[in-house]
Amino acid sequence: MTSNPIFTSMRSIAVAAAALVWLAGGAEAQTKVAVITPYLAQPGTQFYVEGFQAAAKDKGWDVNVIDTKGDVAAVISRIEDVVNQKVNAIVINVDPSQVKAGLQAAKDAKIPVFGMDSGTDPLLVTNVTSNGYAMAAETAVYVANRISGAGNVVMFVFDAFPPVQVRGHIADAVFSNFPDIKVLQRVTPDVADGGIVDSRAKMEAILAANPTPGSIKAVWAAWDQPALGALQAIEAAGRGKEGIVITGIDANPQARDAIAAGGSFEASVAQDFQGIGSTAADAVARVLAGQTIKQSVIYVPTKLVTQANAAEKK
């Protein structure tokens, strides 16, 4: 039997149309997320960005990591850039109060913004981080106990970044509760290169100004890079056997190695960087799926690291 050419043509059109509908439904647009930070030179930042990327890869997202290389002001224009690119979400690692214009641009475009070890702000959905209050208290109390509540302490701080500012503030409070502990100097290092080099230089100057053995009992650092710089300065000055106690926060691989070696660098607090990154990715996924996050801060657990456990696998 001869087929009807008109019927055949109509059937072909119908099949083609159905195929197009199926393709349109099956090929959903890939979720695009921008991660913006001026602090990628810091090991901690590198680790939780990697954690975010790993979690995002499992979710099939397209992640664009933007490093403004220490330029906080540039974060605003980078946020505006990705808003114009119509990303689905933005993750920042910077003080949100310093990039308000960018956050407002994202809000106006209805693009959710998340903090990853940043700080809290009404324009952020939430901030995923470690509990800086607890970490600082733990290391400051460690220092106070190790020096028997007396002596000069050098502090390395960085008040321009909220998660680190909190640590310094809490350590100040702990030390002020010990009448015989004196904060000899509160140092803010240049972090453009990561912080080790300038911290070493500043510690060398402090050591030179305080040459008497025992004149410096401890160095409390709000993160590991200054602690490592201080360690280098102390060892280079031949004062490694003096018993100066050094503590940091982050427990990055270099710090763990130094702690395991049993020298002046005695303790740090291990942040779960991969956990911060993956938890931030989960928060993004929940919001993009239509869920609401009530917490302004989501804390990821930490652990004190000393020589006893420094070699343990994280």
For the regions a language model picked out, list residue spans one by one.
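Bacterial N-terminal signal peptides that target proteins for export
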Residues: T2-A14
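Bacterial N-terminal signal peptides
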Residues: I13-A24
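A residue-level marker of the well-folded mature domains of exported/periplasmic proteins
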Residues: S3-I6, W22, A27-K314
